[in-house]
Design a protein with these regions (language model features):
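Generic structural detector for well-ordered beta-strands
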Residues: 106-108, 156-158, 198-200, 262
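Hydrophobic beta-sheet segments that form the core/acyl-binding groove
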Residues: 103-146, 256-294
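Flexible glycine-rich active-site/ligand-binding loops centered on an Asp-His dyad
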Residues: 138-165
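Hot-dog-fold acyl-thioester-processing enzymes
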Residues: 1-104, 164, 168-171, 175-181, ...
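Local beta-strand/beta-hairpin segments that build beta-sheet-rich folds
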Residues: 148-150, 191-196, 293-299
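Residues that form or immediately flank small-molecule/cofactor binding pockets and catalytic motifs
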Residues: 160, 203, 266
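Glycine-centered structural positions embedded in regular secondary structure
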Residues: 264, 298-302
């Protein structure tokens, strides 16, 4: 099956794949192309997806959103994430899924999306390139209602270690690919001082978010599995932090917007973290830090 671009294969799935099964598949040692490999030339697609209103309500409660008949932009990332994992766990994906770090995210909500609207979701990979700490790659997502694109997303992942042969990482290293390059980084200097709000995060937040999002990466689920993977305690999902920050701006954002974030230091659970935000010329900038504002966990902007 082929899509609009006749050169790109479309892998049509019967439904959203299991993230847990994809993670397990990605843990199996497989010979891969590595930084000098080739990305799969295909898109993964699910059509006619009916959204689960009860699951959305539970997701909204965990992330701090007001439950409405329209969905948060980050919810559409949650729905496309299983397609990302399916691609990254595939044998023809050049980087090993185990060890990939989600370092930045950009999403565009083109218009409000109703919870009752059926969706066509796609995901593909693009732009395998150097990062100052290894190799980075983009996973692209798209949500359509009929023929209308209502949401697009770009998640950037880092494989630490070897870079592509002959490649040089840009000075920025993280946000270099985005049209809004550098804007999220500028947030750190625009918002100074102590946080304007404190969030107390329970030790089981990772399990709560996993239950509503489907992201069952073991670093978020228990201290035992987190320690096996190099963390002293469980860590909060980066996309929970992203969603919680957008929820804190709820009621102040336009109907259509672009949100860009960088993920910095992981949040070890339980924790008390700080949130700060500013607005200038219609652009909201924000950051999530430790409680005194000295260490940054996430920085971002919305416009």
């Amino acid at each position: 099956m082929t899509g609009a671009n006749q050169d790109v294969e479309v892998e049509l799935l019967n439904g959203l794949p299991s993230v847990g099964a994809g993670i397990l598949r990605g843990l199996v040692p497989t010979r891969r192309g590595g930084p000098d490999g080739t990305l799969p030339d295909r898109r993964v697609m699910v059509t006619g997806l009916k959204q689960d209103a009860d699951r959305l309500a539970a997701y909204s409660r965990v992330c701090g959103f007001t439950v409405r008949d329209t969905v948060p932009a980050t919810w559409l990332h949650v729905l496309t994430f299983p397609l990302q994992v399916h691609l990254m766990a595939s044998r023809d994906f050049p980087l090993a899924l185990a060890g990939l770090v989600h370092i930045s995210n950009e999403m565009r909500l083109h218009r409000p999306v109703g919870v009752g609207e059926e969706l066509t979701l796609t995901s593909s990979s693009a732009d395998l390139r150097a990062h100052r700490s290894g190799t980075q790659v983009d996973l692209l997502g798209e949500a359509r209602v009929g023929d209308e694109v209502v949401w697009t997303g770009r998640s950037t992942y880092l494989a630490r270690g070897r870079k592509p042969s002959g490649a040089e990482a840009p000075d920025g290293g993280v946000q270099d690919r985005y049209e809004n390059a550098g804007e999220a980084s500028e947030t750190a200097t625009k918002i100074g001082g102590e946080p304007s709000a404190l969030w107390r995060l329970p030790g089981n937040l990772g399990r709560e978010y996993a239950a509503v999002s489907g992201d069952v990466n073991p670093i978020h689920l228990s201290a035992v599995t987190a320690k096996l993977l190099g963390f002293p305690r469980t860590i909060a999902h980066g996309m929970w932090s992203h969603a919680r920050a957008l929820a804190a701006l709820d009621g102040r954002l336009p109907e259509a917007y672009t949100a860009t974030v960088e993920f910095r230091k992981p949040i070890l659970l339980p924790a008390t973290v700080g949130f700060s935000a500013a607005v200038e010329g219609g652009r909201h900038t924000f950051r999530v830090t430790n409680k005194d504002g000295s260490k940054i966990h996430l920085i971002g902007s919305v416009a």
